[in-house]
């Protein structure tokens, strides 16, 4: 391996470095200087000059192997701000929730009604092995300043197997700046569901990515320590499996902004068993904002999901 120094546009000042094998493909649009042979400067100022297809083909083949070994079904959610109030029985972020006649909103540890941040009408989903085929899954969090992350009692996931007559007195939760109340959902959003395929990337976890181990086993002479090393090649195709995953989804992998909080619990803890991603809710423009453009995630143990037991779901939200 050889250390190359990144030069500025003048070719005179060193502004960075990269470790690469001799003769490696390195990022276009830059000038690089061999550390041990300063006279050897690699001019890569012309975009599209590098034959990077070999790297992409190798990585793509390994990704397909990972898909075959451990596919993670994913349903992508595309929100859009509703032009008018949506029916209470449809999938949505925010707005008036579906509540059966005679049923009130769940309350938090202080006895205050929680707010519904998302509800998924299962009949509107593409065929999938994650959600029940019928009914409604709702996500509720406390309206306190922590948005329910402070206590187990302050967030709920509720499943209604069948939809019947709705409670006409159900109300939406909106923020009120006059009383200094902030809420992640600024406006009701309609949801569109698509199935882009499978996920194996782990946003913000490039060091533990399964592709990392598989790449180093297959190509030890080109070993990398993190998927961030692929950034050297500046290839858009690489983003298909090292991307940040900045979108809302059902299934797939959660998107933790500050690392996976489940790691803070012992290996044998029940929290570690909650591995199925029920919902990742990503910030969306100025309409959905989890803190400073963050995300929220809900995860459940596979056996509880199979039993339609949503009483113990791991919930977290964090921002960048």
Segments predicted by a language model, with ranges:
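Preference for intrinsically disordered or flexible, low-complexity segments
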Residues: 6, 41-320
């Amino acid at each position: 391996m050889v250390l190359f120094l990144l030069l500025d546009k003048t070719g005179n000042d060193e502004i960075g470095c990269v470790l690469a094998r001799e003769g490696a493909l390195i990022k276009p649009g830059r000038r690089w200087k061999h550390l041990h042979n300063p006279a050897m400067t690699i001019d890569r100022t012309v975009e599209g000059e590098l034959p990077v297809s070999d790297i992409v083909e190798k990585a793509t083949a390994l990704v397909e192997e990972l898909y075959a070994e451990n596919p993670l079904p994913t349903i992508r959610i595309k929100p859009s701000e509703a032009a008018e109030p949506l029916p209470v029985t449809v999938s949505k972020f925010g707005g008036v929730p579906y509540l059966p006649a005679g049923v009130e909103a769940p309350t938090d540890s202080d006895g205050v009604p929680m707010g519904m941040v998302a509800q998924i009408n299962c009949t509107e989903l593409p065929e999938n092995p994650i959600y029940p085929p019928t009914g409604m899954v709702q996500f509720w969090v406390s309206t306190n300043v922590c948005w329910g992350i402070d206590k187990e009692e302050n967030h709920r996931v509720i499943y209604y197997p069948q939809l019947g007559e709705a409670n006409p007195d159900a109300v939406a939760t909106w923020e009120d700046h006059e009383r200094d109340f902030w809420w992640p959902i600024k406006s009701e959003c309609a949801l569109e569901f698509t199935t882009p395929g499978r996920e194996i990337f782990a946003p913000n976890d490039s060091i533990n990515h399964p592709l990392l181990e598989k790449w180093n086993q297959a190509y030890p002479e080109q070993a990398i320590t993190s998927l961030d090393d692929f950034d050297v090649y500046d290839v858009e195709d690489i983003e298909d499996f090292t991307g940040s995953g900045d979108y809302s989804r059902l299934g797939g992998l959660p998107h933790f902004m500050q690392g996976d909080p489940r790691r803070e619990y012992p290996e044998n803890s029940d929290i570690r068993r909650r591995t199925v991603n029920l919902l990742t809710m990503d910030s969306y423009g100025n309409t959905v904002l989890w803190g400073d453009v963050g995300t929220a995630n809900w995860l459940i143990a596979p056996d509880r999901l199979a039993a339609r037991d949503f009483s113990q779901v791991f919930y977290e939200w964090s921002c960048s």
